[in-house]
């Protein structure tokens, strides 16, 4: 049976009757018109653009350098320049979560990236110059109020939680509490009171039930009974040589607590115990409502999100400020709950080239650097001119 003639039309002469004529060196099918002899390759810009964006995002969120892509840097930059205009955005689902972890990580160019995470998935992010109440409020208002929020205790975060999620219970990250105690007592304390405080901090992070929590609270009370008077010891300025006065003492301050670090460490544990923010994850009423286990730390966020973002920026060190931010946003988007394929985010305006920068207008007045002298009388009286001769020699 004879083969049916091709209905594909030639883009040159417009006649039907085009047949396949091998492949190009890149593997694309080559077509040849049986009427005019023109040869061409069919193109699908939409598919090509999706493939370019997929390759671009894989490079941007991966470890490979441009040299590993088997293409010159100029070709890669020209081909993927439009990809920087695609903005990944996490669309809120409205789901109410059992818990949300919030924290910020500092990146180059003075930026701080706040993230909200559940089960290792990024729910939202917010750029800011530092962690503060306003930035955290912008982050929290995109998400419905959860049962519990885990935070490292940053003041701006706690204030924003109180305003945006007034009914949400707060869980202080126990690992951050331990780190704060370690900073005050050191990891190998010599003073007996410091040893006791460091022991309480180490015991805090391994508590798994209410019985252990009750025992720990009893140990904190026992520490106060034993060391309470010692913590209240005071040092008076008139009894200390001037060179031994601590640098942080105000000029009009007449006394201070002798054991400042031990006192701060104890107050940290005692205050958080009174506020009931250390063992929120063990609350029976919350665990009855929750469908998953409630964590006591932000380790999941610190290790899986913040550390990975810093590693990403390090692997692509040298990116400009907007490109650095776009790389972090793409990484967060790909690690959200329901990310679309990058090619599905392409919009027509992404493919249009941006406006070219206009020519800079010269500032009015004489030039500061030039190749000749301006003899315009508006700018000089004529005394400035090129000197010739031997200048008296």
Predicted regions and their residues:
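Acidic/histidine-rich catalytic cores and adjacent linkers
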Residues: 30, 37, 41-52, 148-151, ...
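Short linker/helix segments within small regulatory modules
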Residues: 20-30
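Short functional micro-motifs and their immediate structural scaffolds
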Residues: 15-19, 41
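Short cysteine-rich clusters marking metal-coordination/redox-active sites
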Residues: 10-13, 33
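A broadly conserved sequence feature marking short terminus-proximal activation segments
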Residues: 1-8
């Amino acid at each position: 049976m004879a083969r049916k003639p091709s209905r594909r039309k030639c883009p040159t002469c417009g006649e039907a009757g085009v047949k396949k004529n091998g492949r190009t060196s890149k593997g694309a099918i080559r077509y040849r018109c049986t009427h005019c002899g023109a040869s061409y390759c069919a193109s699908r810009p939409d598919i090509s653009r999706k493939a370019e964006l997929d390759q671009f995002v894989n490079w941007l969120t991966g470890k490979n350098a441009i040299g590993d892509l088997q293409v010159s840097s100029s070709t890669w930059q020209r081909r993927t320049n439009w990809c920087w205009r695609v903005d990944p955005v996490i669309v809120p689902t409205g789901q109410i979560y059992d818990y949300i972890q919030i924290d910020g990580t500092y990146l180059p160019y003075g930026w701080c990236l706040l993230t909200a995470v559940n089960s290792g998935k990024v729910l939202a992010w917010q750029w800011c110059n530092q962690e503060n109440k306003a930035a955290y409020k912008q982050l929290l208002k995109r998400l419905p109020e959860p049962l519990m929020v885990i935070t490292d205790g940053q003041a701006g975060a706690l204030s924003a939680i109180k305003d945006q999620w007034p009914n949400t219970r707060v869980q202080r990250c126990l690992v951050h509490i331990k780190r704060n105690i370690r900073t005050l007592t050191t990891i190998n304390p010599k003073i007996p009171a410091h040893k006791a405080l460091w022991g309480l901090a180490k015991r805090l992070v391994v508590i798994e039930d209410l019985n252990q929590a009750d025992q720990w609270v009893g140990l904190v009370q026992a520490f106060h009974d034993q060391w309470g008077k010692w913590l209240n010891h005071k040092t008076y300025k008139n009894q200390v040589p001037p060179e031994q006065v601590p640098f942080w003492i105000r000029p009009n301050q007449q006394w201070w607590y002798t054991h400042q670090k031990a006192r701060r460490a104890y107050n940290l544990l005692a205050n958080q115990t009174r506020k009931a923010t250390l063992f929120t994850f063990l609350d029976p009423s919350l665990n009855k409502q929750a469908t998953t286990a409630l964590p006591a730390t932000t380790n999941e966020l610190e290790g899986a999100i913040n550390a990975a973002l810093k590693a990403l920026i390090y692997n692509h060190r040298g990116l400009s400020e907007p490109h650095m931010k776009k790389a972090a946003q793409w990484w967060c988007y790909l690690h959200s709950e329901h990310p679309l394929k990058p090619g599905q985010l392409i919009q027509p305006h992404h493919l249009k080239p941006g406006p070219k920068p206009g020519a800079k207008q010269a500032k009015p007045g004489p030039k500061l650097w030039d190749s000749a002298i301006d003899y315009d009388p508006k700018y000089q009286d004529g005394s400035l001119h090129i000197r010739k001769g031997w200048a008296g020699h």
